[in-house]
């Protein structure tokens, strides 16, 4: 119960936390959070973890139940949540977290959070 409540309160994805038990994946997640603007490809992520593509995909799926692209999308959006809460405008956020367009960011945000960035901010107040 406590884990479920705290994960929903702080927008923590328990599946992503599971990757913390796998050191190479944990290091990758930290790297993505620190450098969300980098154009992380599947090859980049596999190389970062010193795994083959197939091993990397298998391990990240096992640890998180997500594909590498879903992990990347979720992490970028979680970084954007912190920026939004600090009052930074969406127009200033999207490129800093790796999106080429504002509409692409909006689509990804809605996919991960289930709502638009503005609606999300309104619900936090």
Task: Tell what function each PLM region has.
Residues 1-30, 34, 38, 44-49, ...:
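Short, Lys/Arg-enriched, Trp-marked, Pro/Gly-tolerant hinge/linker segments that flank
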Residues 2, 34, 91-92, 117-122:
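Short secondary-structure transition/capping segments
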Residues 22-26, 78, 88, 115:
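Generic alpha-helical secondary structure signal
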Residues 30, 39, 43, 61-100, ...:
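Terminal helix-turn-helix DNA-binding modules in bacterial transcription factors
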Residues 52-53, 100-101:
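Short coil turns linking two alpha-helices in DNA-binding domains
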Residues 56, 60, 104-105, 109:
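Short hydrophobic/aromatic patch on the recognition helix
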Residues 106-108, 112-113, 117-119, 123:
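Helix-turn-helix/homeodomain-like alpha-helical modules used for DNA recognition
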């Amino acid at each position: 119960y406590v884990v479920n409540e705290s994960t929903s309160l702080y927008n923590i994805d328990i599946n992503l936390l599971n990757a913390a038990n796998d050191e190479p994946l944990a290091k990758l997640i930290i790297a993505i959070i620190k450098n969300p603007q980098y154009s992380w490809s599947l090859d980049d992520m596999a190389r970062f973890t010193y795994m083959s593509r197939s091993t990397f995909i298998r391990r990240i799926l096992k640890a998180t139940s997500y594909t590498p692209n879903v992990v990347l999308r979720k992490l970028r959006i979680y970084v954007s949540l912190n920026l939004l809460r600090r009052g930074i405008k969406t127009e200033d956020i999207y490129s800093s977290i790796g999106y080429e367009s504002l509409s692409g960011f909006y689509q990804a945000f809605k996919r991960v959070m289930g709502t638009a960035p503005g609606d999300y901010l309104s619900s936090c107040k």
